[in-house]
Amino acid sequence: ALPDLWVALRDAVLFWVDAGVRIFRVDNPHTKPLPFWAWMIADVRGKHPDVVFLSEAFTRPGMMYRLAKVGFSQSYTYFTWRETKREFIDYLTELTAGPPREFFRPNFFVNTPDINPRHLQNAPRSQFVIRAALAATLAGSWGLYSGFEIGESAPLPDSEEYADAEKYELRARDWNKAAHIGGEVARLNRARREHPALQTHLGLTFADADNDQVLVFVKATPAHDSVVAVAISLDPWHPQAANFTLDASLWRGFGLVDGEPLDAFEQDAAHAETWRGHRQYVSLDPHVRPYAIWRLAPSPGAARAAAPEPGDARHPSGAHA
């Protein structure tokens, strides 16, 4: 027989489901028995398959992955503590090219009620835009905790906690602050709506860029009917530029001869620019906009590649630098 506590907890969740709640953020699920989560999530989703369970577990990778395997729909990640270009490449490669790609659905939160990351503490507005751009374009799901959009970041001394944590007091916020990045958040979410490639963390290929302060990557759906290139500066203070090299898998996915011209439609731009060959250039100013998003498509007249021979298994897969 099932423990009475398990049934009571399941019934508490169903009460809120009946009230219209469909997303549950579960605090520290790794401190509860895994068999309970496997049973409870399966039972609830058997009745209500649209219910989402988000695992708020900052713990060892093995346990985070086990929670995903027993049924959690989405998971918190180590994105909050990834800061350098190499760290992003290594972590996203783990999530997209390793075993976790089959069962782990990351949700990139830029901050949480409990975590005020050191890279945001007393940082300029541009740093908040950078972190939002990274989360919104690298992950299929992303989130922010109230106050991020107006640059709230004052910490307790030598701590990753907020000095005036909303957990302990009611907050009255000035939503008209000049530092407000609501327009950039809306712009990023608009890009996500327009480009299915940005609605998943998969289909990711990093481009080789000659500046460690500039991260460049391409995301594509399996059919290559949605392909975007993204460049993000990791420097919130100074303009940065980079030459970057697109991977040959991009042309294979389009069915083109390698290096044929591509039309690059930058977000909100009226006209496309033509990218010829693998090597391209980008310049980013954090005081204007520290990121760029392009929709890529074959240029009119681009030469098509010959059909592959039967049994030719070459195809782009996973993330690589």
Model region roles, listed by residue range:
Residues 23-25, 50-54, 73-75, 105-108, ...:
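Structural preference for beta-strand elements that scaffold enzyme active sites
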Residues 29-31, 56-60, 81, 110-112, ...:
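Active-site beta-loop-alpha junctions enriched in small/polar residues
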Residues 16, 26, 53, 113, ...:
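Conserved, mostly hydrophobic/aromatic
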Residues 13-17, 41, 132-136, 185-189:
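Non-transmembrane alpha-helical segments in soluble domains
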Residues 1-64:
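Active-site neighborhood of glycoside hydrolase catalytic domains
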Residues 100-125:
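Active-site clefts of carbohydrate-active enzymes
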Residues 38, 46-48, 61, 65-73, ...:
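Carbohydrate-interacting/catalytic domains
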Residues 1, 101-107, 132-140:
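Active-site region of glycoside hydrolase catalytic domains
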